[in-house]
């Protein structure tokens, strides 16, 4: 018997049944689920200081437990002195057990450490049940050692679901314990 994360077990045993009864699905296969979580960090100053980009990759890897990849600029923006193909950020795509472990850590350990946190804005959804929000400081995660970071920077979290609309997506994430302000 292999290890099953707590949130995955809770989803399988409780959340699916609650969603089926709440939205009157004909089958449990219609219930929305989380497909992936993308955690990204833009490093605008990477143009001048390559060390910042390496530190962002290291921090994302520590936070998520999975190796981060560097992202490149899609097109040149002269105002920001960015050339096409230049490395300007880092991202991690989490699926499976790692995704559930990160979500548990985010909801129960990291978000409660945010100063004056009142919940994630209910308008953080894109119309298709996917939720995107920003975190101002990476130091809310316990894996980051405050003394060893180059600088305090924020990160973006996108939770991609199979929900058909925002109402279903918000209900799914709320059942996982995600705090919403409205």
Swiss-Prot record:
Stored Pfam families: Ribosomal_L5 (PF00281), Ribosomal_L5_C (PF00673)
The keyword Ribosomal protein belongs to this UniProt entry's keyword annotation: yes
Alphabetically ordered keywords of this record: Ribonucleoprotein, Ribosomal protein, RNA-binding, rRNA-binding, tRNA-binding
GO cellular component, one term: ribonucleoprotein complex
GO biological process: translation
InterPro entries, A to Z: Ribosomal_uL5, Ribosomal_uL5_bac-type, Ribosomal_uL5_C, Ribosomal_uL5_CS, Ribosomal_uL5_dom_sf, Ribosomal_uL5_N
GO molecular function, one term: rRNA binding
KW RNA-binding (keyword) present: yes
Complexes and interactors: Part of the 50S ribosomal subunit; part of the 5S rRNA/L5/L18/L25 subcomplex. Contacts the 5S rRNA and the P site tRNA. Forms a bridge to the 30S subunit in the 70S ribosome.
Family per similarity comment: Belongs to the universal ribosomal protein uL5 family.
Described purpose of this protein according to its UniProt entry: This is one of the proteins that bind and probably mediate the attachment of the 5S RNA into the large ribosomal subunit, where it forms part of the central protuberance. In the 70S ribosome it contacts protein S13 of the 30S subunit (bridge B1b), connecting the 2 subunits; this bridge is implicated in subunit movement. Contacts the P site tRNA; the 5S rRNA and some of its associated proteins might help stabilize positioning of ribosome-bound tRNAs.
NCBIfam families the UniProt entry points to: PRK00010.1 (NF000585)
Protein name: Large ribosomal subunit protein uL5
Native organism: Borrelia duttonii (strain Ly)
